[in-house]
Amino acid sequence: MSNANDTIELLKECNAGVKMGVSSINEVLDYVKDENLKSILISSKEKHSMLGDDTHAMLSKYHEEGKEPNPMAKAMSWIKTNFKISNSHNDSTIADLIVDGCNMGTKSLYKYLNDYSDAEEKAKDIAKRLINIEEKLITDLRGYL
């Protein structure tokens, strides 16, 4: 039997993850040189955004708002991104940064799926779809590492 609280919390974490993913991609897009890499990142950003819309729609059924990414995690990501890019303006560095972010994101999402195991199947499906988007992006970026 599903638990509304677990459902809401899982959706909020997915929402924060989507926002973090979109923000991270936006941070690096202007530095990407390879058009194919840029296309991969833009496509992934669009998939993240669409999933964010699904998350918002489901949260609104519970009269809940989305969740912002952890401010400390966002700040650390910004610092790491800007430091690495300032030292190395190449696509390999950008791919490495995004892959690291995806790995952290998927790890967190698997943890949230376990923590909120009584969530509605529809919410679990959103989390799994986000994991799939992140894992596909990792696979797509391997050639740029």
Which sequence ranges carry the predicted segments?
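Alpha-helical bundle segments that constitute or directly flank the non-heme di-iron/ferroxidase center
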Residues: 2-32, 93-117
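Alpha-helical scaffold segments that form or flank carboxylate-/histidine-based iron centers
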Residues: 6-14, 35-53, 91-97, 122-133
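Hydrophobic alpha-helical core bundles mediating ligand binding, dimerization, or RNAP-core interactions
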Residues: 25, 55, 76-80, 109, ...
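Localized chelating/binding microdomains
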Residues: 35, 69, 140
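Carboxylate-rich helix-loop segments that flank metal/cofactor sites and access channels
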Residues: 46, 57-106
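Amphipathic alpha-helical coiled-coil segments
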Residues: 51-61, 88-91, 136-145
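A generic hydrophobic-segment detector
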Residues: 107-145
